[in-house]
Amino acid sequence: MLQEFNQNQKAKVAVCLNKTNSTDLAWWRTWTSSWWANVYF
């Protein structure tokens, strides 16, 4: 039971990390692309 709970927690944490990572990457990508656009144009 406890082992099962630990595995569930790890899975939830992994999902949360993936979500934050993807949103951070998307934000970073839009920010850098707009910055490059400002630099070049």
Curated annotation (Swiss-Prot):
Pfam families: Trp_leader2
One BP annotation, GO: L-tryptophan biosynthetic process
Domain of life: Bacteria
Record keywords: Amino-acid biosynthesis, Aromatic amino acid biosynthesis, Leader peptide, Tryptophan biosynthesis
Role according to the record: This protein is involved in control of the biosynthesis of tryptophan.
Name listed for the protein in its UniProt record: trp operon leader peptide
